[in-house]
């Protein structure tokens, strides 16, 4: 523990962020091409869930997307694009829920008055728009795949390298 204090700064280097952005973009492309699309959503095994959870540890590397690494792992386990993406969205729910409720709790400890109706309206609108966007995203990736996201990640990584030098 003590030896690791401050070590996170070693991996927050712009080169590492740029290269991991490119690397995981290319890995997404490979996984998308390699996926056999054979494993149904209902037959998720403990072993598959464990590997997908373990893969999320790679998201600690700056430039690695937690959602992307979840999708990559699920694709390599032969899940479809849609199922892999649903895994990524479902695994975000606990994190987003914790953030939401911790913000609500912290609002309760502020000295200013809170308009709870506004909080409810904003939360409802956020949920509905997210639900709509997820539906659009799932339809989109089923039709065109992940190639646009791969191109985006590779170009972003190259741009970051360009900025670094």
Model-derived features: positions:
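Lipid-exposed faces of alpha-helical membrane segments in multi-pass integral membrane proteins
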Residues: 19-27, 54, 94-101, 121-129, ...
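Interfacial segments of multi-pass membrane proteins
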Residues: 52-55, 68-91
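Single conserved hydrophobic/aromatic residue that forms the stacking wall/gate
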Residues: 1-11
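Hydrophobic alpha-helical transmembrane segments in multi-pass integral membrane proteins
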Residues: 3, 57-65, 157-165
């Amino acid at each position: 523990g003590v030896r690791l204090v401050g070590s996170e700064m070693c991996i927050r280097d712009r080169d590492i962020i740029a290269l991991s952005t490119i690397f995981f973009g290319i890995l997404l492309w490979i996984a998308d091409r390699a996926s056999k699309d054979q494993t149904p959503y209902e037959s998720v095994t403990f072993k598959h869930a464990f590997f997908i959870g373990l893969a999320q540890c790679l998201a600690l590397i700056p430039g690695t997307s937690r959602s992307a690494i979840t999708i990559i792992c699920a694709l390599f386990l032969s899940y479809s694009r849609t199922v892999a993406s649903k895994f990524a969205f479902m695994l975000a729910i606990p994190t987003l829920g914790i953030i939401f409720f911790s913000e609500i709790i912290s609002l309760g400890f502020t000295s200013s008055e809170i308009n709870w109706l506004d909080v409810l309206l904003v939360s409802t609108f956020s949920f509905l728009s997210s639900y709509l966007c997820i539906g659009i995203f799932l339809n989109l990736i089923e039709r065109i795949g992940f190639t646009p996201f791969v191109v985006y990640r590779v170009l972003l990584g190259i741009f970051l390298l360009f900025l670094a030098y």
